[in-house]
Amino acid sequence: GLKIATGEYIGFVDSDDDIETDMYEKMYNAALKYKVDFVMCDYQRINSNRTNFNKTLDIDSGFYDKEKIRSDIFPALIMGSNIDYGPLLSVCLCLYKRQFLTDNSITFANDVKWSEDNLFSAIVGYKCNSFYYLKTEYLYHYYSNPGTITTSYRAGAWNVYCKMNEYLHNFFDQISDYDFSEQLKIHMIYYACNCLGMASKLSEEDALH
C-alpha cells in the first residue's frame, strides 16, 4: 500500500476496527496547522461485552519538536523500562505525511508479520522532526475480540520477533547520538514473556504440535 499510495497523507485502519467520521479531518487540519511529520490521537477500546474505555497516553498534549521528542519520547521509543510499549506504538492512531515516509525510506518489513507497528513506529519516532498529539481526542475505535491475531497464540511468533529485534539492532546500533541498547534488550525480554504467556494457554495436545 505504501508503494502505490499517492495521497499527501497516509493513515491505517485495521479491518476489525472503525473510526470517528471526522478523525482524519481533525488530524489533517492539525498536520497542516503545525506543519508536522505526523499527527497522533487517542483511542476508545471496545471489549467483546461492549464496554468502552477511553485510552490516553502518559505524555503531554500538543506539539513536539526534535528536542521534546528526544527528552520525552526517546527514553521509551522502542520499549519502556517497565517492559511495556512506548507511546508511539500504534500506526492506527497516526496520520503520516507521505513525503516524510518516502524521504526516509520507512516501510514495513515483509518478514515481520506480527507486531510490525513496533518496528515501524520506532524508526518513525527517531527520524521525525516534529509531531502533534491530539490528547483526549478518542477518534479511533479498537475492538478487543478474543481470537484476533493480537490475542491468540501464533506458531512461529518467536522467530518473527527475533527478526524484528534484528532489524531494530541494524538500525539503532548505527546511531551515535542516543543509547538505545537497554531498550533493545528489554524489547527481547518483552517478546520472550509474550511467547511464553501465549504458549502457557495452549492445551497439552496443541503445545506438542
Per-segment meaning from a language model:
Residues 18-158:
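Donor-binding/catalytic cores of nucleotide-activated saccharide
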Residues 133-209:
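C-terminal subregions of glycosyltransferases and related glycan-biosynthesis enzymes
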Residues 1-6:
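Short, conserved alpha-helix that lines the donor NDP-sugar binding/gating region
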Residues 13-15:
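Catalytic metal- and UDP-sugar-binding loop of GT-A-like glycosyltransferases, i.e.
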Residues 10:
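Short aromatic/hydrophobic "clamp" motif used to bind/position activated sugar donors
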